[in-house]
Structure formats: structure tokens, C-alpha cells
């Protein structure tokens, strides 16, 4: 799926495996602004996984999309807070609630 992020076309790839994307061995998703891709891991139930993986996958996707917005806005290269995972998590987690206000 392709999305427009501040005028840049990003490709979102879901259900990706560690075999195709080795970074998924460490992360459930990542954003690569050098090739405008957002990669989301294939979420599989296990004894250690969260119960609602659909909810979690959406949260991971929002997290990576926010990284892409910060990157495309230029803030990634000019500000430490734009790379701060806690800030990105905050917006990814709270965005659905914020959207209701707008």
C-alpha cells in the first residue's frame, strides 16, 4: 500500500518476515527514509505475544508513520526529540484519542 507523507510516496509493507527484512529480528516495525518504506512485521500469536495483535499492529504502524512524518518535515535531522522513541510512542498511542477531538 502506498501513502503520501508530506508529498513523499511511502510504501507500507505489512506481514513481513525476518527472512525478508533482518531488522525485524529486533523490531516489530521500522521506517527507512532512504527508500521511503515502512515495514511492519508479521504478527503471530505465541505465549509471549499480546492478545490483540491487530490493535498492536495498528499502533506499530502509527509509530512508524509518525517517524516518516518527522523525517519528511526535516525534524529528524535537526532535533533530538524527533528521534525520541518515547515521544513517537506517545503520539502513536494517543493519536486515535486526539483524532476524536478534531
Show the residue positions of the predicted features.
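A glycine-rich, hydrophobic loop/mini-helix early in the fold
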Residues: 77
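Active-site recognition of the HExxH zinc-binding catalytic motif
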Residues: 59-71
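Short, Lys/Arg-rich amphipathic alpha-helical interaction segments
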Residues: 97-102
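Active-site scaffold of zinc-dependent metalloenzymes
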Residues: 1-57, 71-72, 80-93
Amino acid at each position: 500500500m502506498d501513502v503520501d507523507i508530506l508529498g513523499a510516496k511511502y510504501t507500507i509493507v505489512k506481514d513481513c518476515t525476518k527472512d525478508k527484512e533482518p531488522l525485524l529480528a529486533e523490531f516489530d516495525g521500522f521506517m527507512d527514509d532512504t527508500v521511503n518504506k515502512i515495514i511492519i512485521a508479521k504478527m503471530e500469536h505465541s505465549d509471549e505475544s499480546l492478545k490483540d495483535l491487530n490493535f498492536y499492529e495498528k499502533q506499530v504502524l502509527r509509530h512508524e508513520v509518525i517517524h516518516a512524518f518527522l523525517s519528511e518535515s526535516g525534524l529528524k535531522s535537526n532535533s533530538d526529540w524527533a528521534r525520541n522513541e518515547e515521544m513517537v510512542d506517545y503520539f502513536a498511542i494517543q493519536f486515535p484519542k486526539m483524532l476524536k477531538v478534531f
